[in-house]
């Protein structure tokens, strides 16, 4: 379970970085050269999703919970936005959903 969760967090970081770098280029006038590491990051994201042993739909559903929590951590750490109690609650609910789905992988 820990390996799966850590893999999901790495996957989420790859996706967020792959989307954040073009955002910097489009909205913050950063260099277009950021598109190269963005593309590499998104390729890494896709590859990481293939490393899970479950059916792709289950992987995507469970990954969504970790993505929510990771995106909120990114919001706090990178963007400097203070998270509300409801943000934390939502992340907890999303992670609980991920744990429920991943627990069912063995039964399916």
UniProtKB/Swiss-Prot annotation:
The chain crosses the membrane at residues 6-26, 31-51, 61-81, 85-105. GO terms for cellular component: plasma membrane. Signal peptide: none annotated. It is found in: Cell inner membrane. Keywords: Cell inner membrane, Cell membrane, Membrane, Transmembrane, Transmembrane helix. InterPro entries: UPF0060 (IPR003844). The keyword Chaperone does not apply. SUPFAM superfamilies: Multidrug resistance efflux transporter EmrE. It holds the Pfam family UPF0060. Belongs to the UPF0060 family. This is UPF0060 membrane protein Spro_2289. The lineage of its organism: Bacteria, Pseudomonadati, Pseudomonadota, Gammaproteobacteria, Enterobacterales.
């Amino acid at each position: 379970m820990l390996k799966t969760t850590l893999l999901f967090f790495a996957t989420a970081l790859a996706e967020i970085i792959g989307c954040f770098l073009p955002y910097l280029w489009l909205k913050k006038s950063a260099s277009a050269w950021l598109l190269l590491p963005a593309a590499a990051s998104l390729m890494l994201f896709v590859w990481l999703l293939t490393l899970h042993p479950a059916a792709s739909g289950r992987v995507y559903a469970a990954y969504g919970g970790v993505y929510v929590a990771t995106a909120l951590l990114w919001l706090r750490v990178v963007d400097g936005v203070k998270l509300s109690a409801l943000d934390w609650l939502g992340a907890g609910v999303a992670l609980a959903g991920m744990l429920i789905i991943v627990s069912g992988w063995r039964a399916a």
